[in-house]
Amino acid sequence: MENKRPIIAVVLSLFVLIGWSYLSEFMGWTPAPAPVEQNATAVQQKASEPVAQPVQTASAPAASSFAPTEGREVKVDTPLYTAVFQSQGGVLKHFRLKKYTESIEEGAPLVELVTPEAAGKAPMGLLLNGQPTWKLAAWQFEGDDLKLDGSGKGELVFVGEMDGVRFERTLSFDPETYLISEKVRLTDTAGVSRDVRLGMTLSTTSLSPEGGAYNLTRMAWYQDGFHQETSADDLRETGVKVDEGVNWGGVMCNYFMAVMAPAEGALPFKGVLEGGVYRSVVENSSLSIASGSSAEFGIGYYIGPKESDRLAAMPYHLDEALNYGWFTFLAKPLVSGLKFFYSYAGNYGVAIIILTILVKLLFWPLSQKSYKSMEQMKKLQPMVQKIKEKYGDDRQRMNQEVMELYKTYKVNPAGGCLPMLLQIPVFLGLYQGLLNAIELRHAPFIAHLPFTDIVWLADLSAKDPFYITPVVMGATMLLQQRLTPAPADPTQAKIMMFMPVVFTFMFLNFPAGLVVYWLVNNVLSIGQQWWMLRKS
């Protein structure tokens, strides 16, 4: 809910800014003021064959030869990340991204998606009938660390036993993706047929930077074709419990995520926030194992950045993790356009400016009609005022006379409002697109203040540290307001006068990329209004 408040504020402000005077004139209204030990087998493919070549794996020990081994750490190193597992259960201890740092400062640490606090809640742990196997089972590990340099895939096989059930966890790693695939094989070792509940866990601490009001960590899941989320406050109070139909679920912020996706269809999903750790569970409610036989269960884990191109190539509907709200159909092409312009400009700030110019050109005809209608309405204000004075006690007659006046002069009272309102979905789509574009994270525009070494717009996903752009944006709004026909009513005029101040304070902590968009849009609007005034 907290992440939607800025959007609601912008929408309400825009409606007040654009529509109040037209709606009040149209209706004849009088204006009113104003959220143990383990088993794993590690094998790496080293041949010069293509990646599609089968991965060589060591066979797991037979059930009769199972012997627990001493627990240790198992490291998986790929070009994209470094992961450290505990052989006691195959749970994650660390997961560090190699291409992303915590800040833009030199020597900043790499982004850690599984911290020691989260590791204490057993991320990628296996639950058998609700019991933590990483604590209660005996585990065997026979293998080495994995180092994948792009020439092949690799696997880890963790084997454990508990309560007459042997579980073999095979984790598959691809050096070109953040997706980790797992196949769990359950085998009866006690000669008893049984039904078991198999659950997989995933844990992480907050993925958002401290003080990131527009980049909140939340729990999310994909169910019945819809992306759904819940805030940290709701998680603390009630948690999340979805009884069926979840394709994937986990934790995410604007730029990173850690989610699980069952391979064999949608399953129940649960999530809680306790002690600063987000913990989610996907559980298969009933898995049948015949006496002496086996059953299998598959799941995928995506722990990494929300890069649109990577997610589009992923299974399990993971591309739906990029959620832009109601205006997704606008946000996605706008973000694609942003990346296209960046491929030529080499600077995301410049790409935002080019995209803003393009959007402005597309809406140029609508803006022309709006400005023209506003000018016509301004000319009719004296006559409208006379009608109000004459029929002030008879609202119905007054409205009829006002409408007759508009009809006589062929003026549409909504003509200045509607073209502007049509642009609001585009603004909101671009707002969400820029807010969730990981491409803008740590992307510089003007890295230093001109003629100085002072760091300025070195990160378009962060606020302007000196508030220069939001203040200039407020000034452009004030100038734009001066060029716009003023409302006839003094109360309306006062409301409009304060709008630049409201917007300036609202944009002070907005990501710089969003402020640059709105600033450039204002400058272009001023240019268009000036041109219209000269033409008229």
From Swiss-Prot:
UniProt xrefs under Gene3D superfamilies: 2.70.98.90
Region called Disordered, residue ranges: 43-70
Membrane topology: Multi-pass membrane protein
Spans through the membrane: 7-27, 346-366, 415-435, 495-515
InterPro entries: Membr_insert_YidC (IPR019998), Membr_insert_YidC_N (IPR028053), YidC/ALB3/OXA1/COX18 (IPR001708), YidC/Oxa/ALB_C (IPR028055), YidC_ALB_C (IPR047196), YidC_periplasmic_sf (IPR038221)
Protein transport among keywords: yes
Biased composition (Low complexity): 58-68
Any one GO CC term of the record: plasma membrane
Localization per Swiss-Prot or TrEMBL: Cell inner membrane
Pfam families reported for this sequence: 60KD_IMP, YidC_periplas
GO biological process: protein insertion into membrane; protein transport
GO MF annotations in UniProt: membrane insertase activity
Keywords annotated in UniProt: Cell inner membrane, Cell membrane, Chaperone, Membrane, Protein transport, Transmembrane, Transmembrane helix, Transport
Family stated for the protein in its record: Belongs to the OXA1/ALB3/YidC family. Type 1 subfamily.
Known partners and oligomeric status: Interacts with the Sec translocase complex via SecD. Specifically interacts with transmembrane segments of nascent integral membrane proteins during membrane integration.
NCBIfam families noted in UniProt: yidC_nterm, yidC_oxa1_cterm
Role of this protein: Required for the insertion and/or proper folding and/or complex formation of integral membrane proteins into the membrane. Involved in integration of membrane proteins that insert both dependently and independently of the Sec translocase complex, as well as at least some lipoproteins. Aids folding of multispanning membrane proteins.
Record's protein name: Membrane protein insertase YidC
Gene: yidC
